[in-house]
Amino acid sequence: MGAIHDEPFTACGDETECFGGNREGSQSFHSSSTKEENLEDSYLYLVHQRSMSIFFWDERANTGVAGAVDEGKIIDFEFLNPDEKRIIEEHANKEREEGVDVILVNFDRREYMLNLRRWNMGTSPLYILVSGRYNVVKGCRLKEGNEIRIWSFHFDDQLNLAMVPLTPTESG
């Protein structure tokens, strides 16, 4: 299970008031903690919204499942910085073992370490979160059919994803 993140995060947009500037195609982001300066130049990007959860628990297999996201369904590729794009590309071309390390912050502020990779399968590349998805599914008690929205942001130069449920899960 991931660690609890002590600082509440606030995303600007429909639900909350915006603090700070806005960059075209993104929403500004801030932490209400004293570490706000670390997020001063951070932007929040909507990466993906899915009516069937990208993560869910498969009762029959008794395992956590992470669905792949088709490249064409990613809403904004600006969530990756140039170095992260290069790493993803190198992994897809089998030039490196791992993709990009990601911290996923869920709706109750628990953090999970994952690895984002691109797999070239079929006509469109797939982006998938690996190495820890079981913990996300189990810790969040996600079931097939839960609706989620995934946002990205950088904190201290680390790629983070925020998972926001659109439908209730067993844990919240």
UniProtKB/Swiss-Prot annotation:
Residues in coiled coil: none
Species assigned in the record: Arabidopsis thaliana (Mouse-ear cress)
Keyword DNA-binding included in the entry's annotation: yes
InterPro entries recorded: At2g31720-like, DNA-bd_pseudobarrel_sf
Name by which UniProt lists this protein: Putative B3 domain-containing protein At1g05615
Entry keywords, A to Z: DNA-binding, Nucleus, Transcription, Transcription regulation
Keyword DNA-binding set for record: yes
Localization annotation: Nucleus
Principal subcellular localization: nucleus
DNA-binding region location: 69-169
Signal peptide: none
Pfam families cross-referenced by the UniProt entry: At2g31720-like
A cellular-component GO term for this protein: nucleus
